[in-house]
Amino acid sequence: MGLLLPLALCILVLCCGAMSPPQLALNPSALLSRGCNDSDVLAVAGFALRDINKDRKDGYVLRLNRVNDAQEYRRGGLGSLFYLTLDVLETDCHVLRKKAWQDCGMRIFFESVYGQCKAIFYMNNPSRVLYLAAYNCTLRPVSKKKIYMTCPDCPSSIPTDSSNHQVLEAATESLAKYNNENTSKQYSLFKVTRASSQWVVGPSYFVEYLIKESPCTKSQASSCSLQSSDSVPVGLCKGSLTRTHWEKFVSVTCDFFESQAPATGSENSAVNQKPTNLPKVEESQQKNTPPTDSPSKAGPRGSVQYLPDLDDKNSQEKGPQEAFPVHLDLTTNPQGETLDISFLFLEPMEEKLVVLPFPKEKARTAECPGPAQNASPLVLPP
């Protein structure tokens, strides 16, 4: 009996140790450098950018120009975390349009807005799970100085705030033209989103602006002010106003947003290079996505900041390393932090994933950065 008691105590200690949660013993060196033109990396980058655009409520849809850096943290049966640095371009689609970034047009060079996004993206192929854990983006307009050296007569961007009466006039005049030509609904100005000016046969102003439905029709003009107005933007208009000594020229086109219904599969396609198993992952993830009010997904997962162009006086003091400051600090613990991802799975289970800090240094491999869709130095981050 004297020998049985120590033996029982040893067995109890071993069992308790087996049931204890494993200690974090991780190192950022666990990150695997990936080729920026690998088909699966491009597909994951496409999914990440799709979700970045879906998460935003303001601004224009961002388009992938190239993968600048890609690192993967493989977690065995739990899938992989991708740490992506993406060079992006702003398109002509507003995010409220809910259009896939692949289907949005690229802006002409003198209107370009470009930048960089960092994203942490989780993929579990066997369980068919895709999830954007966090992102941050920094954007700048193309340098006015460089545009002027290339095209001195091209339109130049101007502030969109309400203090610029020429911009406000161009928006209200062009919207009035649209309302006059529209036989039923009337619309009012919600917000000017872009503006530029140019001298043609006189001063010309070009504007893009969000519109909302007016609570009345033309026949109700006298009682319109007595009715409440819906403040939700319903479309994006592009207008222009040119004045000469004798007359003015006004033009306008409007593109209306679709209803806020769930996006269809056509809006969620991956990038052109599609591994055969990834579309199945996306299809199932659409069906198994939890409600948007899930506590685990509440709140924004990132942000997009706009800075002046690099030749602006406010940017002169910053060196190349600070040109596009994009910080993604989901965790600063070098050993990583656990992230509860149970809500991503259809089956009731408890799943936790260790997330490492976003790497401060790029992998610097021969395969990165990848080839750019637009290789102009004007729109590539330094």
Curated annotation (Swiss-Prot):
Disulfide bonds join C93-C104, C117-C137, C151-C154, C216-C224, C237-C254. Liver and testis. One of its GO terms (molecular function) is metalloendopeptidase inhibitor activity. It is found in: Secreted. One of its GO terms (biological process) is binding of sperm to zona pellucida. Residues 25-138, 149-255 form the Cystatin fetuin-B-type domain. Residues 1-15 form the signal peptide. Pfam families: Cystatin (PF00031). The keyword Secreted applies. Residues 262-320, 363-382 are annotated as: Disordered. It comes from the Eukaryota. One of its GO terms (cellular component) is extracellular exosome. Residues 262-276, 286-295 have a biased composition (Polar residues). Residues 310-320 have a biased composition (Basic and acidic residues). Its main location: secreted. Keywords: Disulfide bond, Fertilization, Glycoprotein, Metalloenzyme inhibitor, Metalloprotease inhibitor, Phosphoprotein, Protease inhibitor, Repeat, Secreted, Signal. Belongs to the fetuin family. Protease inhibitor required for egg fertilization. Required to prevent premature zona pellucida hardening before fertilization, probably by inhibiting the protease activity of ASTL, a protease that mediates the cleavage of ZP2 and triggers zona pellucida hardening. This is Fetuin-B. The gene is FETUB.
